[in-house]
Structure formats: structure tokens, C-alpha cells
Amino acid sequence: MNKWDERFMQLAETVAGWSSCFQENRHVGAVIVKDKRILTTGYNGASSGIESCAERGECLRRVRNIASGTMQEVCYAVHAEQNAIIQAAKLGVSLEGATMYVTHQPCVICTRMIINSGVKRVVYKNGYPDEFALQLFAQSDVELIKYSDLK
């Protein structure tokens, strides 16, 4: 593992702390870099102008008894990976050939966006139980690496 991998993962963890998700285990951060330069960052939180679960004092998914990994559309939050990709689009920044550092393995929805965004390498720290996302990464030309496996 090189110092840049460490620095960018530390930054992803810092960005995760900005999350407005009510559930602390859902505080996720993402940093997209290319040539050792930060292109964008993202954390999971409500869309611009929408009151977050943290501000509401409750998690919509918990209130409705929605199981983790299901019905992801029933949530105020936009995922960290999605927010990082959206910021690049808003700013006109190409992600072609970039690396994404993310605190958690991307879900299948984020995986599809990452594959189409031009990002070529994803380094994640914590696992997430989404086998289909892993299958999609395996079929794509995007390299998925667990942070602890970096040497």
C-alpha cells in the first residue's frame, strides 16, 4: 500500500463524517482521484434542499421497517458514490481512468453508475452484502480492491 492510498482512504473516512444519515453505520464517504489529484468527493445525505433524516430525528427506512439492501428508493439519502459522480457531472469533470476511494463496498445501484462513469479502479474499506454488485464488477473493466488487500 502506498501513502496515497492511505491518504485518500483517510479523506474518504473524513468525508463520511459529513453524512446526514440518521444511522451512523450508514455514514459513507467517497473520494474520486486521478493522478494524485482530488476530482470530487461525496457523502451520503439528502438531496439539496431536502430535510435529512438526521434533521428529522428518525430514519425513514427504520420507521417503515425496510430491510437493509432492499427498496433503496425509499430513502432521503443519495449515496456517497452517486454524490461524487453527480458533482463531477455538475462541474464538467471527466472521471475517465480515475480511482474512487470509498468507505464501504458499493451497492449494485452505485456499481452500475461507477461502471458507466469512467472510473477504472475502486478501493473500498468495509464490506457490504451485495453479491450482485460483486458480479457486475467482475464482468466489467473496473478493478475492485479491498483496502486491506493493498500491499
For the regions a protein language model found, what residue spans apply to each?
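Zinc-dependent deaminase catalytic domain
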Residues: 1-151
